[in-house]
Amino acid sequence: MDGVKSAGEWDDAAMTQFAVAPGWNVRVFAKHDAQYIYFDFEGVTHAGGRLFPEILVDPRKTQSTAWQKGQWWLHVSNNLCEGNGAPNVYESKGKSLCTHRKPGWDANNPPDAGTEIIEVKISFAKLGVGYSPDMKIGLAFDVTDATGKAGQKTYNWPASAKIDSPKTWGVAVLD
């Protein structure tokens, strides 16, 4: 997870993109092996702005209307933050739960000022599932300016995804 896209590194990946603003699109590449799912977020910087990726995973594709244990929120900014069964889990009892490293997943963080690519790898073991061909998972992405203020901006894929409702997320088929 170095934040550098080597020649051919992502040629075998699926890709989606979503608009942030006119002329600003974020592209997300995804691929996997038997142990990990890998993501590459490109276009996280534009005209002096920076966005930070979040990955929402429903590994058993339960498509519940509200969060349940086993559904993951993974956030990459100056630290890695995660929630199992809840989004936006930054602290508990006044103590930060975010760190530079987390068991079962990794990313190139904190991103340097010039970092334009965020790479993430998540183990299937972290998600509590084993890989099997043609498995389907619930999946959504968002990028946020991570200000922590009321006006914090967030952009989603799929566009209709709601962070609080796994039922609204997309479905990924891992072949």
Regions found by a protein language model. Give the residues of each.
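Structural preference for beta-rich elements and adjacent junctions enriched in aromatics
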Residues: M1-D175
